[in-house]
Amino acid sequence: MGKQQDWSVTACIFLSLSLASQIHCSSQTHFPSHKGGAGLSGDTSHFNSVSRENVLSLKEKDLIEKLPGQPSGISFRQYGGYVAVNEPATRFLYYYFVEAIKPSKSTPLVLWFNGGPGCSSVGFGAFEELGPFRVHSDGKTLYRNPYSWNNEANMLFFEGPISVGFSYSSTPFDWEIFGEQADKLTAEDNYMFLVNWLERFPEYKGRDVYISGQSYAGHYIPQLAQIILHRNNQTFINLRGISIGNPGLDLLIEADNENKFILSHGLVSQKDFEEYSKVCDFANYDMDECPKIMPKFSIEHNKHLDVYNIYAPVCLNSTLSSEPKKCTTIMEVDPCRSNYVKAYLNSENVQEAMHANTTKLPYEWKACNHYLNSVWIDADKDASMVPILHDLMGEGVRVLVYSGDVDAAIPFTATMAVLKTMNLTVVNEWRPWFTGGQLGGFTEDYERNLTYATVKGSGHSVPLDQPVHALNLFTSFIRNTPLPQTP
């Protein structure tokens, strides 16, 4: 599926991009939770349009003239606004859309999801990872990301479920049903968002569509893709492929294989690993001894270690700078970058420019709603996505799974264990892949159009930690070309 194109075009892109020098910010910062939805009034104009004129007016209304602090020389268009996902309209998801730098009628549409569940794709995906801008240390100004994925595609980021980021419900405590219905209702709302967004942007109907993301998007993406295929006889969406980085696909299998990564990177001793394997084994669980050894393996609680990239520094000072830091290189890590994004998106002039927070929500924008995560039912978190992946591949949907090789949250050892359970035949053996002469990682192809790749030196957020390799990986996938096998 997808058209073959000459890799030399991509090689030229990466050669020119490699000359760019920008600041690179990296880490995973947690924010307190909030409860969303109480006492809000919804604007029902965001829901179904009744005429082409209304569709056009809604689209024009969403056009972002210019983001505050945006650098000069930006030619691509940006949009932001709300799309209702139920009828009567009470649940509204916020989106941020950036057109491709060099758009054409064949340029694909790509949806991006972050995980959580309960984390913002606008905050993380658009402004920290693969969007066209990143936020300076002053929390007010932006700088270009030369490796933005809108070099190759039209990029659509939206925040869901309701109560995440700027998304909300006008029905009090509506968010509570997401704790009960969780994955199912989220998938339904995500589907209705896409259908209604395409009504507002009808020029993208019939385009090749790809769905990408990371982490708990390992649930969001397969479930949305499944609904799209099941309902394509009603509303056709030209889904060509899905790609998921460091994905949560089968929590139980992943949990059994995380400690191999922890041991191999020197985070625990061989003695402790052997003791853990002995007393915490599911079949021979020791109720007295396992709780004693368990804390040594709960590295996510170590405030001195970034579990999302074990080699990245942690943020020690959350204070914004009065002036932007001087430019360094895009590969340099700023562990406090999430604080800059939070300050930027909570600015009133930014919200006004992005057509966000139009109802004046009674809480500030946060990167993650941890309360929503806490009430998400365990049965959904534990559910395996492997059967859905098999169904999607059976319908001809191409699948790319990739892992940053220094992520301890969902390490490559866990993902490879899940892929092993799929019992797929390897068609192209394990081999290195390259970007601009540098080793990008390793890859393997399976039957039925599934590719797995590791990304050297990256943590949980591959487009953040290794933006050049990430763009190479993404471009190869949507062009349906092999990853370069030679330097």
Swiss-Prot record:
Disulfide linkage: C119-C368, C280-C290, C315-C336
Subcellular location(s) of the protein: Secreted
Annotated GO biological process: proteolysis
EC number: 3.4.16.-
Keywords linked to the UniProt accession: Carboxypeptidase, Disulfide bond, Glycoprotein, Hydrolase, Protease, Secreted, Signal
GO CC aspect terms: extracellular region
Active site: S215, D407, H460
GO MF annotation list: serine-type carboxypeptidase activity
Tissue specificity remark: Expressed in seedlings, roots, leaves, flowers and siliques.
Glycosylation: residue positions: N233, N317, N357, N423, N449
Signal peptide range: 1-20
Enzyme class per UniProt: hydrolase
Annotated function: Probable carboxypeptidase.
Family of the protein in this entry: Belongs to the peptidase S10 family.
Protein name: Serine carboxypeptidase-like 38
